[in-house]
Amino acid sequence: MTLSNTERAIIESAIRDIKDFPKPGIVFKDITTLLNNGKAFGVTMNHLYEKYKEYNLDYIAGIDARGFIFGAALAQMLGVGFVPIRKKGKLPYTTISEKYSLEYGFDEVEIHLDAFSAIPNARVLLVDDLIATGGTAAASVKLINQAGALCVEACFILCLSFLDGYKKLQELTEVYSLVEVK
């Protein structure tokens, strides 16, 4: 399922570009303007609902922090549970974690060990606002699988395709994005 030209235009026009943030030479894609535009947010969420309503999902997993917004909203629309994937040290119960590399070092994400224990072999959709290099998303897919579930697809509002992160992620799961930034 793809966006219509009208839907794509509504979503793209609602995302603000911030030049030189967080450092010179970077153009930051600010989704807060999409979130505070009821029409654009509605078009986004309705499209995701229509795409995923027949996937027989058990959970939506959202990546800290903007993935929580889209993921929790979609989970409610689909009538499934929501599972947060957080930066290390933010979850209160027993967790498993996965490291991933950054430009200068490493970071780590974690999930509750029992996040999917209520449904054996749970079918999970991973959601985040954007995929760039793919490190966080790849670590998140690995966590979902380590926790005993199956990540059936990873979904992003934006894909920065020039960074090739989606290619790395395609080795682990199917990948879908609403808007591609070349």
Curated annotation (Swiss-Prot):
GO cellular component: cytoplasm
HAMAP family cross-referenced by the UniProt entry: Aden_phosphoribosyltr
Catalyses which reaction(s): AMP + diphosphate = 5-phospho-alpha-D-ribose 1-diphosphate + adenine
Biological role stated in the UniProt entry: Catalyzes a salvage reaction resulting in the formation of AMP, that is energically less costly than de novo synthesis.
Location within or outside the cell: Cytoplasm
Protein's name according to its UniProt entry: Adenine phosphoribosyltransferase
Listed SUPFAM superfamilies: PRTase-like
Entry GO MF terms: adenine binding; adenine phosphoribosyltransferase activity; AMP binding
Lineage, top ranks: Bacteria, Pseudomonadati, Campylobacterota, Epsilonproteobacteria, Campylobacterales
Pathways per UniProt: Purine metabolism; AMP biosynthesis via salvage pathway; AMP from adenine: step 1/1
Assigned keywords, A-Z: Cytoplasm, Glycosyltransferase, Purine salvage, Transferase
